[in-house]
Amino acid sequence: MTDLKKAAQRAIELMDLTTLNDDDTDQKVIDLCHKAVTPAGNTAAICIYPRFIPIARKTLDELGAEDIQIATVTNFPHGNDDIAIAVLETRAAVAYGADEVDVVFPYRALMEGNESVGYELVKACKEACGDVLLKVIIESGVLADPALIRRASELSIDAGADFIKTSTGKVPVNATIEAAEIMLTVISEKNTKVGFKPAGGVRDAAQAAEFLGVAERILGADWVSPRTFRFGASSLLNSLLHTLELADAPKPTQGY
């Protein structure tokens, strides 16, 4: 197996296969569950809006794919600074049966100089999650400034995040290697049990390999696993299956 094929295989096993569109329906989520069961093995998780968790759970159970985790989003996509609402949404997501919650950090508040609200929001949402995995989306493409990306990562980890994630996929700049370097470095300094999730903009096996390479260089080859590394993506899967010669070449897409 070539290095590119190895990267494609790994990326599938590390993927949060995602649909977070305004026109999502039960049928689109059912289709996503079927796609997550790939000829190259199951993806790590699917990521969907909270209201679709019950139909996703039913579908994955019917497919015998109980190992696929169900992730959802809260305080999404704008990263508002209302802690009470973020906590209520997170509690509701857990009550719906989410295995993992991806919450958006109040990044605009941080850009305006308010560090405390981000810390308090993540801390409160982690308490609401209990054993459910909490991934914190810092929206690195909007923060842009390396110092802000670093600070959002530090605050999230200090507040109890299980993962830090680059992006919502709803802004012009999503996952970048530059942001990955900063975020993975903070993990190496603070707590290597915290995971990293580049999301949006990873289009093919070569780009996936680049992100995996940065993680391995900073944290070691043994660090990367579904417990510590995920790709958030919608259009990436078809490209990876094509690399593995298990699907036709993907059509051009505007997908996440």
Swiss-Prot record:
It is an enzyme of class 4 (lyase). GO terms for biological process: 2-deoxyribose 1-phosphate catabolic process; carbohydrate catabolic process; deoxyribonucleotide catabolic process. CDD domains: DeoC. Pathway: Carbohydrate degradation; 2-deoxy-D-ribose 1-phosphate degradation; D-glyceraldehyde 3-phosphate and acetaldehyde from 2-deoxy-alpha-D-ribose 1-phosphate: step 2/2. SMART domains: DeoC (SM01133). It comes from the Bacteria. Pfam families: DeoC (PF01791). Its EC number is 4.1.2.4. It catalyses: 2-deoxy-D-ribose 5-phosphate = D-glyceraldehyde 3-phosphate + acetaldehyde. The active site is at residues 102, 165, 197. GO terms for cellular component: cytoplasm. It is found in: Cytoplasm. InterPro entries: Aldolase_TIM, DeoC, DeoC/FbaB/LacD_aldolase, DeoC_typeII. GO terms for molecular function: deoxyribose-phosphate aldolase activity. Keywords: Cytoplasm, Lyase, Schiff base. Catalyzes a reversible aldol reaction between acetaldehyde and D-glyceraldehyde 3-phosphate to generate 2-deoxy-D-ribose 5-phosphate. NCBIfam families: deoC. Belongs to the DeoC/FbaB aldolase family. DeoC type 2 subfamily. This is Deoxyribose-phosphate aldolase. It comes from Shewanella sp. (strain MR-4).
